[in-house]
Amino acid sequence: MRSHYCTDLSSNDIGKKVQLCGWVNSYRDHGGVIFIDLRDRTGIIQLVCDPKDSKSAHEIGSKVRDEYVLKATGTIRARGEGLINPKLKTGEIEVIVDELYIENESAALPFVIGDPNVGEDIRLKYRFLDLRNTESFDKFKLRSKASIACRNALDRLGFLEVETPILTRATPEGARDYLVPSRVYPGSFYALPQSPQLFKQLLMCAGFDKYFQIARCFRDEDLRADRQPEFTQIDVEMSFCTQEDVIKVGEEILKDIFYACGHDIITPFRRMEYKDAMETYGNDKPDLRFDLPMVDVIDIFAKSNNEIFSTPAQNIKKNRAKAIKVPGGDNIFSKRQMQRFEEFVRKFGAKGLAFIQVKEDGLKGPLVKFFEQEQIDELIKRCELKVGDVVFFGIGDKKTVLDYMGRFRAFLANELGIIDENKLEFLWVVNFPMFEQNDDGSYSAMHHPFTMPNNPDEEDLEDITSIAYDVVLNGVELGGGSIRIHKNDIQQKVFKLLKIDEAEQREKFGFLLDALSFGAPPHGGFAIGLDRLIMLVTKSASIRDVIAFPKTQRASCPMTKAPSNVSNEQLRELGLRLKGKETK
């Protein structure tokens, strides 16, 4: 039906006969001549319906309204002097229409296409209209390019694309499973996969050597700006590899993906130990586009003459004292800002926010009187303080201090406006703890229980590290992976450390333990969140902007009204009955 997309045309095509299809973006009648902005997925071009050129086209053009679907045939001509629109890619040309056909009409719109002020609920209810603009199309075009680049890179490296089951069994992977009742086996349930983790390990046991999949995954968890109940990840696994081998593949894939998206990134990426990331930046996914590191000052606080500071500083295993210096901050921050800073950290468990200002005549602030000159001199030296600086302090429980000071670091960077939004700072965080302690004192796997520990014979679980690695971009975790356990005895030992007894091991993971018993090769891999990656590349405010039909933050779809009720007959077929609720 069409000869060109709208923005395929330029001044080089003047005099060419074309046939275009699209939607009416806007229309206007100027002195009997009708001008229509025709929009397709690439952009906009101006149609001119002049009765001098075609009475029939002018007559039909007088009937069009916003979002009518048109087919237009005409000739490209240059716009007149002073009529060029520099805001349009096709702003130097227009189409003199000799034939116009209305393919379809449109009802009154619930909102103006492309209006940034429309609420998200109404946008998602009419998602098919919300997507009907070039900005949205460009994001999905970029997503498509990224997927193609990923597949091409992995194919070049010898990986096989293999699809793994969507209907599987429930396994503990950190979040709640979505369950699907079985009609054939009443009372039994499938689970939608949180990841293809176990299946890709089984493919390594099968000798496939190199696997990948752009996989759909499902997690029934509380949602945030960068989370969805169903999401897509680039899933990779390889045999006979080391951590270095896997990281090299990950970097090569990311380099190709970002090149396809218009960015030439430098490899290899920086590396940082998990412990260093936590102690210096307060989290395991630091944003390295700005500085503001945390400095350890617990030994200085241990010598304070105030027990509020000295007592917690005596226990360096459980507590922390951290300082963040802001160069020139004393000349930047107002009293009101300083109050806001304290209000901010209190939201995350801080009891307050101590600070010291560096003046011409020395250090000032409520903390100074609690230290001798020797400690003051050490603070100046360690924090590299200069006149005009301000340094903030956090002291107390290790987990709490690292959390709120890490958050405060990012908050300060935003307040100071020092984050370069066009910068891409990649980082590998390595050597994660194998286990983390829960609020009830029990332990769980930090990544998952199939990760190879570095030192499985260590008695203290908190001292066991794993061969695990995360890739971080601008303070956001893009993905991660690990070298896997490939020996049955080590896997059983890890299960035992997690208080999973032999009966439960056989019940939930018998197929994996069997596979590890028949000559499983050393293997490892990683997964990268494709949705999150595209969100960052396109600078979208939410992951929902780069998913064609996303769920809301309450895991619902306003457009299809999912999740929905089902009939009693459907429930009976599945052997189910809802407590206290009957449906028709």
UniProtKB/Swiss-Prot annotation:
Residues 197-200 are annotated as: Aspartate. Aspartyl-tRNA synthetase with relaxed tRNA specificity since it is able to aspartylate not only its cognate tRNA(Asp) but also tRNA(Asn). Reaction proceeds in two steps: L-aspartate is first activated by ATP to form Asp-AMP and then transferred to the acceptor end of tRNA(Asp/Asn). Homodimer. GO terms for molecular function: aspartate-tRNA ligase activity; aspartate-tRNA(Asn) ligase activity; ATP binding; nucleic acid binding. The keyword Thylakoid does not apply. PROSITE patterns: AA_TRNA_LIGASE_II. It holds the Pfam family tRNA_anti-codon. The record marks 30, 82 as: Important for tRNA non-discrimination. Gene3D superfamilies: Bira Bifunctional Protein, Domain 2 (3.30.930.10), GAD-like domain (3.30.1360.30), Nucleic acid-binding proteins (2.40.50.140). Belongs to the class-II aminoacyl-tRNA synthetase family. Type 1 subfamily. The keyword Nucleotidyltransferase does not apply. Its EC number is 6.1.1.23. This is Aspartate--tRNA(Asp/Asn) ligase. InterPro entries: Aa-tRNA-synt_II, aa-tRNA-synth_II, aa-tRNA-synth_II/BPL/LPL, Asp-tRNA-ligase_1, Asp-tRNA-ligase_1_N, Asp/Asn-tRNA-synth_IIb, AspRS_core, GAD-like_sf. The gene is aspS. Keywords: Aminoacyl-tRNA synthetase, ATP-binding, Cytoplasm, Ligase, Nucleotide-binding, Protein biosynthesis. One of its GO terms (cellular component) is cytoplasm. One of its GO terms (biological process) is aspartyl-tRNA aminoacylation. It comes from the Bacteria. It is found in: Cytoplasm. L-aspartate binds at residues 173, 219, 447, 484.
